[in-house]
Amino acid sequence: MTKSIQAIRGMSDTLPEEIPYWSFLENACRSVVSAYHYREIRFPVVEQTALFKRTIGEATDIVEKEMYTFTDRNGDSLTLRPEGTAGCVRAGIQNGLFYNQIQRLWYLGPMFRHERPQKGRYRQFYQLGVETYGMAGAPIEAELIFMCLRLWKALGLESCIHLELNTLGTLDSRNAYRQALVTYLQSREKELDEDSRRRLHTNPLRILDSKNPDLQPLLAEAPKLIDYLDETSRRHFDQLRSLLDQAEVPFIVNPTLVRGLDYYTHTVFEWVTDQLGAQGTVCAGGRYDNLVELLGGKSTPAAGFAAGLERLVLLLRGVQECLDKIDIYVVIAGEAVIQEGLLMTEQLRNVLPEWVIEADLSGSSLKSQFKRADKSGAKWALVIGEEEIKTNTVTLKHLRETVPQKNLTRDTLISYLKSEG
């Protein structure tokens, strides 16, 4: 027997019963970002490897260990995108979107990282990315956070996701803090785990993001970045917190919050849940004013966020009822009337275009069809058999309430269904 081919580890199939949750989520994303007049942009899933090395940082875990990189037939080093911001900036520069312009952009699509797969973490994963360009200051950051909260409310998730904030300050203040942190960690280097000792010499701020419980007491005593902020950075962060307070958006300041990408400055934020274990971050973002210039464009203030759709779907399944709704399941009694049943179902769709109607064309027994009708979650079963064809009637059975079934003429069926909704 020929061995079957399996999906690549960490790259899962999305099956039909899961799609309604994805569709609900994607539609909510599009609705919310459109309400703020952000415009969609699409760019390739494959970019030159140099793009990510320059933006994400060569000393980051993503570039060092997680990127899917290959050499094409022309000898060029290419990479499947591990995140969307770098590609969005590249597209903006290449197509002149940032030249003396303000841009509000969004995208939705797959990203790729070679991480250890577990619940909420996959090697192919989907993100909603939202990016703003040309606007400095805290107000646009507040708008991004307001947008996130509006999305959680649209999804019914606002009670299980909370906001954490921090500031990385300007590059000057962050460099001063970096030196103080390195000095502190070097004095306690023997207490660090192997991964943190490696990061100490490459990307020391990432040690603050360690999930190792044995390191938490040591990190709690580490210097705090907020103590190294210059006056400009302090005013920026204070204004953002004031705006969130005025809008009654609850948040906590997390001094150990850093982002895994080197290009962030000033504000960083994460939306976190306690319902997904270790993969509790469902959305993260911040400000990255130096990124456009880093990629060869004109100095342009920028901010944005990315939300992980797989993790949001996991949360959705816990709070939303089945989203795969069927209004009518058409039971066709006997192979002799399948064609008539199919044509009548199509006529129903013409006059009830908003209704979801499924016709059973299997030719199987009534018992089997009613089992499928009940399992489908449909509100009504509409029975069409030889007797109904002869008398120009249908039998309508309510599947969710214990009420007598009705025998209706085809003319009265439509008005009855509309009245029952």
UniProtKB/Swiss-Prot annotation:
UniProt-listed Pfam families: HGTP_anticodon, tRNA-synt_His
CDD domains: HisRS-like_core (cd00773), HisRS_anticodon (cd00859)
Gene3D superfamilies: Anticodon-binding domain, Bira Bifunctional Protein, Domain 2
Any one GO molecular-function label of the UniProt entry: histidine-tRNA ligase activity
Annotated EC: 6.1.1.21
Keyword Ligase (UniProt): yes
GO cellular component, one term: cytoplasm
Keyword check for Oxidoreductase: no
Family, as annotated: Belongs to the class-II aminoacyl-tRNA synthetase family.
PANTHER family for this protein: HISTIDINE--TRNA LIGASE, MITOCHONDRIAL-RELATED (PTHR43707:SF1), HISTIDYL-TRNA SYNTHETASE (PTHR43707)
Complex and partners: Homodimer.
Designated name of the protein: Histidine--tRNA ligase
Species name: Coxiella burnetii (strain CbuG_Q212) (Coxiella burnetii (strain Q212))
